[in-house]
A protein has these predicted regions:
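N-terminal core-binding DNA-recognition domain of tyrosine site-specific recombinases/integrases
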Residues: 1-25, 30, 70-73, 143-149, ...
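Basic, Lys/Arg- and aromatic-enriched nucleic-acid-binding interface segment
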Residues: 6-10, 14-16, 29, 33-91
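Short, charged phosphate-coordinating catalytic segments
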Residues: 25-36, 84-108, 189
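Conserved tyrosine-mediated DNA breakage-rejoining catalytic core shared by Y-recombinases
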Residues: 52, 58, 87, 96-134
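Short, basic (Lys/Arg/His-rich) helix/loop patches that form interaction surfaces
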Residues: 68-71, 137-144, 152-193
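C-terminal catalytic core of tyrosine-transesterase DNA break-rejoin enzymes
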Residues: 82, 86, 173-201, 205, ...
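A short, basic/aromatic helix-end/turn motif that makes direct DNA contacts
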Residues: 96-102, 170, 192-198, 207-209
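DNA/chromatin major-groove-contacting recognition/catalytic segments
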Residues: 123-129, 133, 208-227
């Protein structure tokens, strides 16, 4: 049909089949159709597409933009996005961050220990040197007016960074995972706990990861890389 986007992702096609399959099965059960075509047909699941994220070069450009900016409003938005980028915290979690309540010290280093508002899952993420600078600039409280205005501002920042995708609050979280953490050799096991991800197969395992274990596996590499 004219104006309809072409579905190119096998994962997206699989999801359409998954939803449609349940209706076909119900129609077959009720006798509305003579046979269930899905009994002889299986679609491939496909691989999930990569999450868009900023590269290390783009992150460093963003840091320079903040250092050179004298606009108070722009600085507040930039700091909030950078705070998300270097903690992996979702918008709602970053907005409700309380330094006195959420900071713990392990092996002489500070970490943010909290629970995700969306899922209730615990997360522990390091306070990197650059994160501390951001907190100091904002009196240890990250404040922002609204998510809508924040995303509007980020569209302009995305253009300045030559992003091939819309820059949103979610991109900061993806950037933490792909560039800040995995890019410095953090294991997926530790990253999952740091971000408070939910996984049916491993939730119980990660929920029991002691903070000492997380600290030992993060090591000094992230702290040295992002000053």
């Amino acid at each position: 049909m004219k104006g309809k986007p072409i579905i190119r992702s096998q994962a997206a096609i699989h999801n359409y089949h998954k939803r449609f399959k349940s209706y076909v099965a119900e129609a077959f059960r009720l006798g509305l159709i003579k046979e269930n075509p899905y009994e002889r047909f299986q679609d491939k699941r496909g691989e999930k597409s990569d999450r868009p994220h900023l590269t290390e070069a783009q992150v460093k450009k963003l840091i320079r933009m903040r250092e050179e900016s004298t606009d108070a409003v722009m600085n507040r938005y930039l700091d909030f996005f950078l705070f998300q980028t270097f903690t992996g915290m979702a918008y709602s979690d970053a907005k409700s961050f309380d330094y006195e309540q959420h900071i713990v010290t392990i092996d002489g280093k500070d970490y943010i220990d909290g629970h995700r508002i969306k899922t209730g899952n615990e997360f522990v993420t390091p306070v990197l040197p650059i994160t501390r600078k951001i907190l100091e600039r904002n009196n240890y409280k990250m404040e922002i007016t609204s998510n809508q205005k924040y995303n509007q501002f980020l569209k302009g920042i995305g253009l300045a960074l030559n992003c091939s995708f819309p820059l949103t609050t979610h991109i900061a979280r993806h950037t933490f995972a792909c560039t800040v953490a995995l890019g410095q050799g953090i294991s997926k096991e530790v990253l999952q706990f740091m971000m408070g991800h939910t996984s049916i197969k491993t939730t119980e395992i990660y929920a029991k990861l002691p903070m000492q274990y997380v600290s030992q596996n993060i090591g000094d590499k992230m702290f040295r890389a992002w000053k």
